[in-house]
C-alpha cells in the first residue's frame, strides 16, 4: 500500500471509487462490455479498470473510436470497482457529462 501511495495511485482510485458510487446512486452508469457497447451513443465517456484484459481493452477502444467517445483507464482494479458497484466489471459507461468530467480529470 505504501508503494502505491508514493505513486499517487491510491488517492486517484479512492476519488474514482467515490465518484462511481455517486454515479451508481444517480443511475448514471452502464456496466459490462455488451451493455456498454449497446448504450455507447448515450455515454459521456467510458472508464476501464487497470486490470482489464488487453483483448477487452482493444475491443472497447475500437467501439469508443468508432463512436467518438473518450476512453479513460483508471488506477482501480475490477475488485475495487466491485466493492462499490456490487458487480465485478472492468468496463463502465458514464452517462452524465459532468460526472464523467469529474472522473476523467484524475487521469
Which residues does each PLM region occupy?
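Short, compositionally biased "basic patch" segments
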Residues: 1-14
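Long, amphipathic alpha-helical "stalk/connector" segments that mediate intersubunit docking
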Residues: 3-4, 27, 103
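N-terminal first-folded block
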Residues: 14-48
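Positively charged, polar, low-complexity stretches
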Residues: 22, 33-38, 55-81
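Short active-site oxyanion
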Residues: 26-27, 44-45, 67-70, 90
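Short secondary-structure boundary segments
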Residues: 50-51, 75, 96
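Short alpha-helical
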Residues: 54-55, 98
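C-terminal structural segments of small proteins and small subunits
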Residues: 79-107
Amino acid at each position: 500500500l505504501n508503494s502505491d501511495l508514493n505513486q499517487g495511485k491510491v488517492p486517484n482510485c479512492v476519488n474514482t471509487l467515490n465518484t462511481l458510487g455517486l454515479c451508481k446512486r444517480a443511475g448514471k452508469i452502464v456496466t459490462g462490455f455488451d451493455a456498454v457497447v449497446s448504450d455507447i451513443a448515450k455515454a459521456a465517456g467510458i472508464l476501464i479498470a487497470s486490470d482489464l484484459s488487453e483483448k477487452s481493452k482493444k475491443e472497447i477502444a475500437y467501439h469508443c473510436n468508432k463512436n467518438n467517445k473518450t476512453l479513460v483507464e483508471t488506477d482501480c482494479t475490477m475488485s475495487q470497482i466491485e466493492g462499490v458497484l456490487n458487480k465485478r466489471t472492468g468496463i463502465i459507461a458514464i452517462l452524465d457529462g459532468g460526472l464523467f468530467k469529474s472522473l476523467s480529470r484524475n487521469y
